[in-house]
A protein has these predicted regions:
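N-terminal leader/auxiliary helical segments
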Residues: 1-83, 88-202
C-alpha cells in the first residue's frame, strides 16, 4: 500500500477504536503506520509475509509480553502499534505477495487504484465498527495463528482491489483490537496487584 493508504487506515482505526490514550498519541501512531516505508531497508526487503513476518512478531512482542505495563500507553507503544498495522496491511495487498506476477509498473498502477478505493471504503457507513466486547484472543500466539490462517484464506480469493480493502480492514482491526485488549487486561491485573487484590478475583 502507498503511504496515503496507510494513513487512511490509521485514521480509520483511531476513529473506530475510540481509545482515549491512543488518541493522545495519534501522531506517533500515524508515523508508525508509514515508518517501514521510510527506512533504507524498504529498498532491499519486500514487505511480504515471507520476508517480514519475524519482524512483525517482534513488533507485537515489544508492546505485549516485553512491554513495561507501568508506563501505560505511550508514544513508543503507539508508534510500534502503527508499524504493526503497516506490515499487516501490506500482507493483504496483492502486489506484496509471491503470487503476483506483474511488473513494477503494474504494481504501482494497482496500488494507485487501491489508494483511491481504500480511501472511499474506510469512509463507508457499513465499514465502521465497534470493538469486541469479549476477548477473542488471549495470547500473541493466538493472534499470530489468526494472521497466518487469514492470509492463507486471502491467497485463495479473487485478487481485486475491493477484496484487498475488505481483508485489510477486517484483519488489521481485529489484530489491533486484540493487542489493545491484551494491554487492558494486563493493566487491570497490574492495578489489582498494586491494590493488593488477589489475582484469583479476576
Amino acid at each position: 500500500m502507498r503511504k496515503k493508504s496507510h494513513i487512511s487506515l490509521a485514521k480509520f482505526l483511531m476513529n473506530n477504536m475510540k481509545v482515549e490514550d491512543l488518541n493522545e498519541h495519534k501522531k506517533a501512531f500515524y508515523i508508525g503506520s508509514i515508518l517501514p516505508d521510510c527506512r533504507p531497508s524498504f529498498l532491499t526487503r519486500k514487505h511480504s509475509i515471507d520476508a517480514t513476518f519475524p519482524i512483525l512478531i517482534e513488533e507485537i512482542k515489544k508492546i505485549t509480553v516485553d512491554y513495561d505495563m507501568e508506563q501505560g500507553i505511550t508514544g513508543y507503544y503507539c508508534r510500534h502499534l502503527g508499524v504493526i498495522t503497516h506490515y499487516l496491511a501490506d500482507y493483504f495487498t496483492f502486489p506484496h505477495n509471491s503470487i503476483f506476477q506483474g511488473s513494477i509498473k503494474e504494481h504501482c498502477v494497482y496500488e494507485k487504484k487501491l489508494k483511491f478505493t481504500f480511501k472511499s471504503y474506510v469512509q463507508e457507513e457499513d465499514t465502521q465498527r465497534d470493538r469486541e466486547q469479549k476477548g477473542t484472543f488471549h495470547s500473541i500466539d493466538e493472534i499470530i495463528r489468526f494472521i497466518v490462517k487469514t492470509h492463507r484464506e486471502y491467497l485463495m480469493t479473487l485478487k481485486v482491489v475491493k477484496e484487498d480493502c475488505q481483508f485489510i480492514v477486517d484483519l488489521v482491526y481485529k489484530v489491533v483490537d486484540a493487542i489493545l485488549q491484551i494491554f487492558e487486561l494486563n493493566m487491570m491485573k497490574l492495578n489489582m496487584k498494586n491494590e493488593q487484590i488477589p489475582i484469583e478475583c479476576l
